[in-house]
Amino acid sequence: MFGLKLWVRGIGMRVEAVLFDLFNTLVLLESGEVFYTPCLKKLHGFLVKNGVNISFEDFRRVYFEVRDRVYAETEKSLEEPHFNVRVSRVLRRFGYDFDVSSPIVVGGTGVFADEFMRYVRLDDEALDVLRRLREKYKLGLVSNFAIHECVWRLLDKFGLREFFDVILVSGEINKRKPSPEIFEKALNALGVDASDAVFVGDMPGLDVKGAKDTGIKAVLIERKPVERILDVKPDRVVRGLRELLVVIEDC
């Protein structure tokens, strides 16, 4: 059935593929980034057990300094260094020379991811909507996350992996949204043109802008009021996943 092109009411285009963001689109994070402190505490505890002598307050402060520095360094390139890079750089700030592949860095990232997963839940509508869209379209996932292994685990945990023909995670390919490159990789893997694809995501500055800059139509899933970027306008706005069945399938 792939290759069938359907007319999308309100978007005015033919669609072969639907691409999705992951976080706060298909799966939901507890609001306010409440996961950060408990995740950092787990990471810090792992490091302390392995001989690192740093107070949690100092560790937390330096972690955010390093994280912000990494994003500043990659603002133009839109690269996404793996989370291991952050851990390694934090440790070096305190005089501990562990490279990104060392067991203590990899292990620390792992415990951070384990805790993070506790703050993620599946959207109640996700499985049914994906199942129904899968009958007519190629599906792809394009996610920004510095721990790609965690994304794969979440997809397996919630039974999402099977729905997608391509899955791209920024931390795995070292490129993040809104870079057109990550969208283009997804399109190439699916074998579809940008004009025949729709992207669904919750962040105007990343999902909508990245899709539009690549020539893909964008549907913003607005779960809560967000600051709209004036020069980035989605083609459609929905409040929940089930509305996609009307936007995309009601032809």
Residue ranges and their predicted role:
Residues 2-18, 28-30, 34, 50, ...:
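Asp-based, Mg2+/Mn2+-dependent phosphohydrolase catalytic module
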Residues 23, 35-74:
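Conserved phosphoryl-transfer catalytic core
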Residues 28-30, 71-73, 113-116, 136-137, ...:
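A short, structure-level motif marking secondary-structure boundaries and short turns
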Residues 34-43, 80-91, 145-146:
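Short acidic alpha-helix initiation/capping motifs at coil-to-helix transition points
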Residues 39-42, 86, 125, 129, ...:
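Charged catalytic carboxylate motif
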Residues 44, 48, 91-92, 187:
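Residue-level preference for well-ordered alpha-helical positions
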Residues 57-110:
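A metal-dependent, Asp-based hydrolase signature
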Residues 77-85, 100-104, 110-139:
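Short, acidic loop-to-helix structural element flanking the phosphoryl-transfer center
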